[in-house]
Structure formats: structure tokens, C-alpha cells
């Protein structure tokens, strides 16, 4: 059985880890970095760049460079969070036929799952390069507060990338696994995982217990905000820079895509620098033109200023913390350790806010960028059976229910219920002789169904005619270990039933997923074709160079006709190398090799002659050694002398 890898698919950065010799290992990517920017760029020639190369060219290609795509995964175009992003992102967010938020790139509409799959493919390749074998199975992490549609979409992204997603695991839970196995001492303890990443915020209260030598991780509660993270912090700085520049120069940079991309890079840099210094300078020369002259952006920003810009965002994380503590049935003083996860937790003000709320310093010995991927790899080793001393009990983050008479949300499974779980309840009809019922499934905490997230609907037909309230329809909710919901309805009188795996009533259809899988495979084929073409080019170039060199040295030993034949073959190969037809390059390379055969024979004969002459000279030298060294060749003489002296010196 191959390795099950652990992937942290992040909004800003992604990371991949494996278990090796019982220990987790984070794998460096092809650029030598342990994390990969979650950035994808679509080039004019059809090439797709992922990670650092994509991020580097973002300034010159803003409309086709996609980042923070995780904020759109499993979301509808009309959701207010998506509408907010439309005004902020340089790329074009569009409405798909199924109502989802997709992205338009180079006249093609792409689903967030398809784009995220490119990052997952890069993570898969990173692991394969390290292991030297194909990887097909993975555990992928999601924010704990992701709803069913977002989890399903993440799983679909894995499929498109060619991965069998063995488990979807919550990010804070993964971080707790990494902490518990590495730093967690003996005995029972309660920990809070505060996870503020690039696009999402989660808080989970987790109990780590030692049960008969087995380490048990039980999630007591979870809460969060799937649209709050580092990207929002960056946006506050971007808005501030644009406003200040406008005040000083009277120019509005918010409509200039290239200027915006430069400001975004500067804002992110400034945010990171202000975690370790009190002041930084934002310096972007030639940012705009005014009256035919260039205008430069030069602005000092202090840590205090940054904190005032983002204070409201940081305080937005505290209410979910309060709710999570309450839902877990514990007091703040019961928490033994606070684990910080996500790059944003490096910000001193965030650490200070967490300390003020929990009344103790958060731990600093967990790597906020890598802990989640490490936890995913640990869970992978549990699923593959390599590790048996560990049990993970996670929860569903939001209540699940169906719409009943009057638009009421009747909750079937309450939030923070340990998963996997199953629950059944009997319902009846609202009208006389009602032949069918529509089961509408919702997720959320509001009392009325319309205020919650609609996950899907299906019909149960063929109910025998009877008075309202008579038929007995049993509705069953079943949540698997991935947190994905399966719903069934059964008419107890007839035994008729209907079941569905809830997919967002938008979501991707099986046909769409299959098509995207094929597209991804075609891309892989195209990558392979380009690689083979590059290799053929390199070999062709090397052949031209070596044949030319040999022709210069030994060409005078050839007949004129043979020499011309070789030169003509080289010229044809050079012409083929200007194009991109691998078959033509291979054919012309073979022709050069055939034409240069006589040249090779001449070179070989020449070398043989030189060696023979050298050997003959050596024999003569050896025979005369007893009489006089002067008779042999000078270099032979040197060799013999050296040997002779070595022995003498001993």
C-alpha cells in the first residue's frame, strides 16, 4: 500500500507532509521551500504556473493570476462574501450556470475546485518526487467551520487532481494531533486551537486524553468565520495606502490592476515586517504617471498604525472563542494550552488579544505554517493502519436539519455532535392525499430555514392517498467521518425510499468532475509532451555542437562528399530545432548520427593509433629503464621516475 500523504490546502500557502519512520516530515517543493504559495497563473501559451513562479509574475499578469481561491470553493455567486470579494480581486469572478462562483481566465470559465486541484497536483508531485513513487491517496484539511458544500467541493478538487481523498479533516484538529503527539505530556488536558490563516478563522476546544494507552483526541466544540483571515488584513493596508497616495498626489490607484498588484505585494511584505519591527517603509517607484512625469509611492507605516487598521478584524475572532468555550461546557480557566496556527498568529497584536482572552500566554513551540499538514499526515498513518494508538473524535460544526411547515428549520443533528453520526425522525404530510414530499436540507443555526445555507433537496414520491398527518415518513441524516452528509427518506407504509449524498444544490455534477479529471490528465500529458520536446531540443543542440567540433578537428580526413553530407544533415537538424515538432527533431538527429558515422570511424581510428603509439613508447621506456631513462619519451620518463622515487622515499 502506498503512502497516504497529508495536505494542508491553504488560502495563502499550502504544505504537504508524510510519515517516515514513525515521524512526520514536511516535504520541500521543487523550489526548496517547505510551503507553497496557493497561487496559480494561466499563461498565454496555455502553460499553468503554480506556487512561487506564479506569484513572481503576478504584477505583470494580474487578471490571470489567481490567489485566495479557497474563499470561493463551494460558494454561490450571490453570497454576500463572494460579492465583497468581486470588488477586491483583480481577476474576474463570474456566475456559473449552477449558480456557483467561478472564475473567468483567458475566456474560459473555471470552477474553484478545478483551480484548487492545480495546487493539490503540485503537492502530489512534491511528495512523489521525494518518495520516488506514485502517490494516489491523501488526507486533506479544511477549516473546521467549512459547511457541507465546501467540504464536498474540496473532496472534488482532490479527485480532479488524481487523488483518492481518504479523509477530510478539520485544520484545528490536525494541529492538535501534531501538538499532542509532539509536545503533549502525559495525562488529560484541554487545549484551544486558535487558527487564523490567510482566509479563514477557526477556534476549536479539544480534549486530549490517555485511554488505556491510546491517545484520544475529542473535539468538544468548534466555531469560526470562513471569510476572515490574512487577505482581509492585507486589504485594510491596501485601502490605507491607496487613500494616503490619493491625499498626497490626487491620483486614484484602485482602478490600475498592475499598480494594485504591486501594492498588494507591498502590503503583505509590510504586514510581515511589522511583526518583528516597529516601523517599515512601503516603496514602489514609478507607480503612476502625472503630467507626463513618473510618480513614486513612498510611505512609512508603523506597527501602531497597522494595529489600528486591523483592530476590528482581530476583535471579530473573540466572539467565536466565547461561543466555543460555552458550547464545550468548559470555563476559560479549564484550558491548559493555547495553540496558535496560521501565519496571521505571528502578529504580536493577535497574540496579545489571545492572551487577554484566555488569561495565559499561547504556546510558541508549534510551527503555525506546518502543524496542520503534519496532523493530516498523522491521520493518514492512522487510516493506513500504520498507527493504532490514536483515536480522533471530531464534530460537525453547524446544525443540520430540514424545512418543515411554515418554513421552520427542524434540526436533526445539533452543532458540535461527534461524527460519524446517524439520526432518524418521523415526519408526515401537510395536505390531504399528498402524493409526494420534498425534503429540503439546510445547515446553520437560524430558527427559520431561509436564514440558513440550503444544501440540497430531493423528492419522495408514490405516497398512497391518505389524510394529512397520516403517512409516516422516516427521514434519516447520516454524517460520515469526512463531515459529509447523506440523507434518506422512507415511507414506512410502502417501504419506498430515496437517498442522496448531499451535494450543494449547485456543486459539480459527476460529468463535470469527470471532464475536469480528464482536463487535468490532458494537462499532465501536455506537460509530459513539453518536457520530452525540451529534452529532444537539448539533445539536438548537443549533437549539433559535438558534430561540428568533430568536423573541425577531423573533417580534413573525410572525402568532400561525406563532409558535405554531414554539413547538410546538421543544417536540416538546425532548421528542425527552430520548430516544436519532436518527431522531426528526432528524425533529423538520427540523420546527423547516421551521416556522421564515417567521421566517428575516423576519430576512433585516430584514437587507436595514438594509444598504440603511446603503448609502444611505454614498452621501449620500460626495457631501457635499467640502462638509461633518457632513451624513453619524456612523459613516460616522468611517470617511471615518480614511481621509482615513491618507492625509494618509503
Curated annotation (Swiss-Prot):
Belongs to the heat shock protein 70 family. PANTHER family: HEAT SHOCK PROTEIN 70KDA. This is Chaperone protein DnaK. It comes from Janthinobacterium sp. (strain Marseille) (Minibacterium massiliensis). Acts as a chaperone. Induction: By stress conditions e.g. heat shock. The keyword 4Fe-4S does not apply. The modification Phosphothreonine is found at residue 200. Pfam families: HSP70 (PF00012). Residues 608-650 are annotated as: Disordered. GO terms for molecular function: ATP binding; ATP-dependent protein folding chaperone; unfolded protein binding.
